[in-house]
Amino acid sequence: RTTLSTEEWLMSSIAEKIAASAPEVNRYLHFGLTSSDVLDTALALQLRDSTDLLIAGWTTVAARLKSLARKHEHSWMAGRTHGVHAEPITFGVKLAGWHAEALRNLERLERARELISFGKISGAVGAFTHFGTDYEAQVCKALDLTPEPVSTQIIPRDRHADYFHALVLSASAIERFALEIRHLQKTEVLEAEEPFSDDQKGSSAMPHKRNPVLCENLCGLSRLIRSYEHAVVENIGVWHERDISHSSVERVVLPDAVLLLDFMLHRFLRVLDGLAVDPARMKKNLESSKGLVYSQKVMLRLIDAGMGRGAAYELVQRSAMKTWKTG
């Protein structure tokens, strides 16, 4: 059993390969560098390129939401607050709100991509003891990265925490959309349903079930990504110019969160592509509250006619409560 750390084993393996294939340059391997020069700069490349995939995913989702919003601009439904009918809206307006949020997540990811695209070749404790800043600038330019303005032996982890927050907000947006679809798929509502294939089973015990399992899965994955953020923020604090307390955390949460968010974007796109919307049911549900959704309009008309606001509110509320009880 080896007693080498992963980092030591990797460097040893690379050294052996170079020694065998290019012995004349072997002595310059890792010359004047510290491991974090390689690892942190490589991590910046990984996160930058991964973010490009997430941006592409959100771009596709945003386009689909825009298309659906236009399709349902006249699909009237009950707007709900606290789960109770409030005033009429259209399903198109709801989707337009999702589209706007998708665009905000795109903007955040683009900023996060820029924020994380920093490298460092400043050596031990970031002191440039063996190389000058010009060498760091050359390496970063070749990699299309920006040199970290003032590094220690590592790139400061507030960058990674800021980057990660963009992932958290993206996941939370998908959860919000998926949660709404779950509510709309309730038997008592049944205004929209996620896709359900002909050979799919909703329950092992109850053959009639059509459970919103895709959207439930998305909500669960969002919780997982959010739970990682605490650890990422904890990584900001390290001892002096470097320790490795952040390393074990990042090896788990960074690749996991990026992969999960990419999966969530693809899964949500699948939900949108197969979303079954029932405008007739939306209209029926809207009408089920017997016109109570127009209570504010009635109250404002009474006020315009000269009645005091308090009296108008009381009159409409009294009538509304009677309608609630008697229909």
Predicted segments with their positions:
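Generic, well-ordered alpha-helical scaffold segments in large soluble proteins
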Residues: 9-13, 17, 64, 68, ...
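A helix-coil-helix interface module used to build multimeric assemblies
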Residues: 1-128, 132-138, 147, 200-203, ...
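Short runs of predominantly hydrophobic/aromatic residues within well-ordered alpha helices
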Residues: 3, 7, 160-163, 295
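Glycine-rich cofactor/substrate-binding loops
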Residues: 1, 206-327
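Hydrophobic stripe of amphipathic alpha-helices that form coiled-coil interfaces
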Residues: 68, 72-75, 109-112, 116, ...
